[in-house]
Amino acid sequence: MRFVSLAVGAALLGAAGASSISSNVGLLKANGVALGNWEAAYEKASAFVSGLTTDQKLALITGSNVESANGNFTPLYFLDGDMGLQDFYYVSAFSLSSALAMTWDRDAIYEQAKAVGSEFYNKGVQVVAGPTSQPLGRTPWGGRGVEGFGPDPYLNGLATGLTTKGYVDAGVIPGGKHFLLYEQETNRTSSFGSSGEGSPYSSNADDKTIHETYLWPFYDAVKNGAGAVMCAMTKVNGTMACENSDLLMKMLKTELGFPGMVWPDMNGQNSAKGSALGGEDYGSSSIWSTSTMESFLSNGTLSEARLNDMAIRNLIGYYYVNLDNGRQPTRQTTDVYVDVRANHSKLIRENGAKSMALLKNEGVLPLSKPHVMSIFGAHAGPIMGGPNSNVDVMGSGPTYQGHLATGSGSGMASMPYLITPYDALTNKAAQDGTVLRWVLNDTYSSGGGSSLVPSSTSSTAVEPSFENFATGSDICLVFINALAGEGADRTELYNADQDAMVNTVADNCNNTVAVVNTVGPRLLDQWIEHDNVTAVLYGSLLGQESGNSIVDLLYGDVNPSGRLVHTIAKNESDYNVGLCYTAQCNFTEGVYLDYRYFDAHNITPRYPFGHGLSYTTFHYSSLAIKAPSSITKAPKGNLTVGGPSDLWDVVGTVSARIANNGTLSGAEVPQLYLGFPDSADQPVRQLRGFDRVELSAGQEAVVTFNLRRRDISYWNLKTQQWMVAGGKYTVFVGGSSRDLRLNGTFFLWVGS
């Protein structure tokens, strides 16, 4: 893609002509958005568009070549995803976003995004189809939750914003997705007979739910430089998301001040008129044909101002990340040897280890040169066909018969190689002189009771079974996974075969460690209280270095610091949101997802949101709160890219002292939760800050959390804006949503 002979002139959008839209809502300049550092990109984009004919503008917004007096433009190239480039050789396979979120590490999230972005840039790809904020994880049965950052909007939003910034700084356009309320695979394109033939389901939610939960992360994306947003293939409140003017023109482009383009997910664009007027900016030429669009212009259905706005939005992200400087390498075919991986394997290994949460440890970890170690489960070793075997989750089983380290569909990376736990443990055993045995499937058990050396022979051979290998082992490592992805939702939150394997091994091995990699919440209660299950490592999908990351944790080369981004329940019935099988999917739970629902109904989880152990211990003290005595009820700032300017103002701080009172260096993740006055109608408490602090044994540090206006605001349905409630706020600081070690209060007087 290149601009050549670009003539820059001053051209702004013209006044709106007659249109079926009653106002200029959603048009960039008509909104009065203070563009800030987007202004230069806007001027370049509008100058280029000013010299185009109607046909050329239509070519631009449908992804065709444009040749004009102002220069030539070749279409932007869009590609998945956050875990690395799809369909290319010589690229890296990174941790999935759900794993990255489990690091609770701002630097890790940003640095991975920048590394991913650099590989896109150097392969000649302009638009990353990401970050994937949503599916948020409304239901633990959702198939694509693994691709996102989890169901807490604050954590999801921060990770979405940091990922967006990483892509921008790498020189590519972030294309945040999926907008909006796309939370399951079931019936995403299916028909419902006479109730909606051929239509996807409709996600129905009120404004409070939308703003406080699902729209929240997109504020962060827009604020940090999103140049594109993908509208979902499903409906919202009865209208296709890509034709929904309330979502696209009102919320995204006006409330959030989004300056970039909206483009559709697969099957997201259904009609020419609906998508053009609803807020889509880039679409299919088969739907937006020249004759159709010209007829819309001539009869006043589509205004010239809206067409210009669409064209400018297609270009503004390109200029914003400076792709017009001519430095990006030309895109090659996928198999051409252009190695863009740099030293990203080191980053992938580090982030994978940072992301795994130690849920349980009764002194068995870290390992230290065990004499005899056995490993069990298909998840420990490679799949027969290699790491890039096609994974079609439609109709597949709920587990993966090999080491699961990347997603499927849009969430599947292009693996250059895969280090499995079997690979990494073999190397470690060779270094330590450990006898290593393995059964690399989930169901191989033919009875047992044999000792390490059978009496019938002088060989060390043992009939392979769970019982035989577990008996006589110093340590038993059992690897299990849970599979789901694009195209199919989950059918279970546990697996009978895998759970039986864990119990069988534990019945015969005093030190059984379970290692779990999963696409979403995975229930553990079939074996978690077994006396011989002495440790559990739990995480998401870690990418090409997965086995090394896991073994670094098992042996203590890395001290665990990962934290859960979802609640692990004791029973499936403890979760309040299941899959929807009807045409109308009503989000009647409102904002009460995950820990917010568990807290509201006083349900005891197996492991709470934010939980994770370390090989050392930490002490919390010295809570200090600095809050204003008064504040205006609503934001008064100008509309900027990312919403009202003062919505982002820091209005208070909370600090606490964290001390490592153990014997090993480690990282703690202190978390800030906030309880609102009753008048705000909010959950019991909500995450409103966190940090990851590395401390040597005996070291301590003061951690400070900034409270922004948006962090103490709620969405007022009557006034249709963010408001601050007056009254008492309760502050909690601790190691999880249930491990709250410090608390205090502050009062706010709210003026007009």
UniProtKB/Swiss-Prot annotation:
Entry annotated with the keyword Cell membrane: no
Biological process according to GO: cellulose catabolic process
Catalytic residue positions: 265
Any matching Pfam family: Glyco_hydro_3
Intracellular or extracellular location(s): Secreted
List of glycosylated residues: 187, 237, 299, 343, 441, 510, 532, 571, 586, 638, 661, 743
EC class: hydrolase
InterPro entries assigned to the protein according to its UniProt record, in alphabetical order: Cellulose_deg_GH3, Fn3-like, Glyco_hydro_3_C, Glyco_hydro_3_C_sf, Glyco_hydro_3_N, Glyco_hydro_3_N_sf, Glycoside_hydrolase_SF, Ig-like_fold
Signal sequence range: 1-18
Record key words, sorted: Carbohydrate metabolism, Cellulose degradation, Glycoprotein, Glycosidase, Hydrolase, Polysaccharide degradation, Secreted, Signal
Task of the protein: Beta-glucosidases are one of a number of cellulolytic enzymes involved in the degradation of cellulosic biomass. Catalyzes the last step releasing glucose from the inhibitory cellobiose.
Family to which the UniProt record says this protein belongs: Belongs to the glycosyl hydrolase 3 family.
Protein name stated in the entry: Probable beta-glucosidase D
Organism, as annotated: Aspergillus oryzae (strain ATCC 42149 / RIB 40)
The organism's taxonomic lineage, starting at the top: Eukaryota, Fungi, Dikarya, Ascomycota, Pezizomycotina
